[in-house]
Amino acid sequence: MKKQNNGLIKNPFLWLLFIFFLVTGFQYFYSGNNSGGSQQINYTELVQEITDGNVKELTYQPNGSVIEVSGVYKNPKTSKEGTGIQFFTPSVTKVEKFTSTILPADTTVSELQKLATDHKAEVTVKHESSSGIWINLLVSIVPFGILFFFLFSMMGNMGGGNGRNPMSFGRSKAKAANKEDIKVRFSDVAGAEEEKQELVEVVEFLKDPKRFTKLGARIPAGVLLEGPPGTGKTLLAKAVAGEAGVPFFSISGSDFVEMFVGVGASRVRSLFEDAKKAAPAIIFIDEIDAVGRQRGVGLGGGNDEREQTLNQLLIEMDGFEGNEGIIVIAATNRSDVLDPALLRPGRFDRKVLVGRPDVKGREAILKVHAKNKPLAEDVDLKLVAQQTPGFVGADLENVLNEAALVAARRNKSIIDASDIDEAEDRVIAGPSKKDKTVSQKERELVAYHEAGHTIVGLVLSNARVVHKVTIVPRGRAGGYMIALPKEDQMLLSKEDMKEQLAGLMGGRVAEEIIFNVQTTGASNDFEQATQMARAMVTEYGMSEKLGPVQYEGNHAMLGAQSPQKSISEQTAYEIDEEVRSLLNEARNKAAEIIQSNRETHKLIAEALLKYETLDSTQIKALYETGKMPEAVEEESHALSYDEVKSKMNDEK
């Protein structure tokens, strides 16, 4: 409770609310006390009261630009308003005094005095009170002063990392690292050998710029690292700074943009000023698309805060003043939405594509991340690399980390191949749900569904090999089949894609042939198949009818040119027809394969119902010999205590 109370006390908004009510109450009571139970009347009412002879005393007192008039009634008046704060129903009170305010015009004051004298009212004129002026001034200024104080305090807190000084709100939020603090080297970055070769010259520029400038070469102003998330763009930037031995300033693109106009541009100026003082230096901007999107094409357009920030960044990178010794390295996975002025030579001279690693790169990455993990002798990192096509560095690190967690969960002292195999499944499909209650009918349906995918994949194995099939539920899937490419592929042929389409259709076709039903289990298969078939027709020009024309590209996100419809209704209809034709062709091919291999299909399904998971060796044996490998056959016997405990640990 004490911690919660301390948090409430430190909350600036609660203090602001408290001060507001305090000042409001002070003003209210101050005005109430000054009135002393009097009634406020206007000039017309004042003249009427004097004319009626109901004024006993009248006092004039100048107060700044007005004259305050107060007086006493001869006959007190009744009022239901009263003064001060009333907590109950207001009572009828007698008002003996009144106040009014008039402008200091000579004719008005003299006429009012003459009128009061004629009606036998006692008139008194007082000099202006200096203390009253200061009190009124204080009451007017104090609330605004308190408000500004809290605003500046909150702005100082929002400045983050620059102390509590409110004037640091526009300072850069970049994290600065000295060359001694950067321990990352090129040897720590695996699977990006070509990318490192592109960055070697940048390191040489920073180490020995005279070697290049004497030949008339210009130091690159910036390097743009583009690639999918998790490929190691940030790590590469740190490695460049580490190899060059220069200070490293890192900041996210979103840190520049705030709700206050001009703050982003101020932070850009501050960042480059700090880098100039430490030159030679590297500025790393992560996710630069947050601030570098094309100007004038977002929602609302116009010269908004983001555009001002981008303009300042353009000027700093290649404006009137040079930035000798400063290299900007930026990372993004959406270079298509960046402003063309940012991508031109002179700003980002080098564009390095950091792609997904090949099998050798994946093996090297696994070796780097396995340095601090005890691995059993049966762990083959080369095999793991072959089983993880398309994985980036972050995915591979996650696989080994999950394997370590699985081994710890099973009370092991080292990580073996079964732990890594389980980790791969968890990363690809999610955690297993062995405790999930599934009816026998559904288990059979899932088994034949996955066996359908498997048998089609076994027959059409020119490009891909069936690696594993299981009916253990994981994530949203009731089961799944994994088919891996025989080797890393940069390009896919039309036949390769048709084989994949047939494999995706194998599950639904098996349901229809064996059980004569259609279930929702094939929804994800259809989604993938439709996307692939549409890409074949609209992007890759693989339709004989429509020809080698690209009808659709990558749909732009907010910040780039919005896609406009550039095809006719007839062409759109023909595209749909071609997509449907490809999918029907794949469906017929899958049906033909399953009908021709009914016995093998049944064997795989029955093995799945018995063992739940089959690896590539077991699948191959069933396909070629019709039997499971002898090593897998298990004898039925009563389990000992140690065997029961071991089995429980394996199932955790």
UniProtKB/Swiss-Prot annotation:
Domain of life assignment: Bacteria
Keywords (A to Z) from UniProt: ATP-binding, Cell membrane, Hydrolase, Membrane, Metal-binding, Metalloprotease, Nucleotide-binding, Protease, Transmembrane, Transmembrane helix, Zinc
Cofactor note: Binds 1 zinc ion per subunit.
EC number: 3.4.24.-
Pfam families referenced in this protein's UniProt entry, alphabetically: AAA, AAA_lid_3, FtsH_ext, Peptidase_M41
Active site, per annotation: E450
Cited function: Acts as a processive, ATP-dependent zinc metallopeptidase for both cytoplasmic and membrane proteins. Plays a role in the quality control of integral membrane proteins.
Assembly: Homohexamer.
PANTHER family registered for this protein in UniProt: ATP-DEPENDENT ZINC METALLOPROTEASE FTSH 1, CHLOROPLASTIC-RELATED, METALLOPROTEASE M41 FTSH
Cross-referenced NCBIfam families: FtsH_fam
Protein name: ATP-dependent zinc metalloprotease FtsH
Gene that encodes it: ftsH
